[in-house]
């Protein structure tokens, strides 16, 4: 399994394989998979949140999100974490 740059990855479900994932929980600056951690857009540093476009709740919305826990300047959707 290729950890990718700095041990980060392109992840599959739940931040784990399928895909090239880094150390648990397998989050990084590449495109990541479905909830609970990531959506279909690029995500930032562990725990998988950052300034790139992010996916569905509970952590991300369809627009760019800020620093951990994945909320911040951007376009977060309504939900229990926003």
Curated annotation (Swiss-Prot):
**Which residue ranges does the record annotate as region Disordered?**
20-82
The protein depicted here goes by the name: Proline, histidine and glycine-rich protein 1
Designated gene of the protein: PHGR1
